[in-house]
A protein has these predicted regions:
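Thiamine diphosphate
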Residues: 1-4, 11, 19-23, 28-137
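Active-site-adjacent substrate-binding region
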Residues: 16
Length: 140
């Protein structure tokens, strides 16, 4: 959260290699091609674990860069469904917990990888500002 106090700092906490690749590619494009005055703060882990392929969802890369995307859904029972959000080191444990919830307690879930809580915050602040400046466009 400290990185949110620096306006041109883009911070990420990816879990999987494909997330890091998407972030690096976009960072190079923004800093070198577009010459944006930004820098990246990326937290990575040194734990050795299997990395899945990038999901087939067409919105996956956009979600990675915006800060959150759905990586998995358990929907066998269609009664109770919970949303699980996680990033970095805890995400893999959350996936394991979702499997336990489904197998032992019949609770379905959606698992969301949060690559950047700061980017989500920025997006929310931007929407809030737009709504304040465009009150006549808001439909209640």
């Amino acid at each position: 959260m400290l990185a949110s106090t620096i306006p041109n700092c883009i911070s990420y906490d990816p879990t999987f290699g494909y997330e890091l690749a998407v972030i690096f590619r976009d960072g190079l494009r923004r800093m070198h091609e577009k010459k944006e005055n930004i820098f990246y703060y990326i937290t990575t882990m040194n734990e050795n674990y299997p990395h899945p392929e990038i999901p087939k969802d067409k919105n996956c890369e956009e979600g990675i860069l915006k800060g959150m995307y759905k990586i998995k859904e358990y929907s066998q029972y269609k009664k109770t469904k919970i949303q699980l959000l996680g990033s970095g080191a805890i995400l893999r444990e959350m996936i394991a917990a979702a499997e336990v919830l489904q197998k032992e307690y019949q609770i379905d879930s959606e698992i969301w990888s949060v690559t950047s809580f700061n980017e989500l915050r920025r997006d929310g602040l931007e929407v809030e500002r737009y709504n304040l400046l465009n009150l006549s466009l808001i439909h209640i």
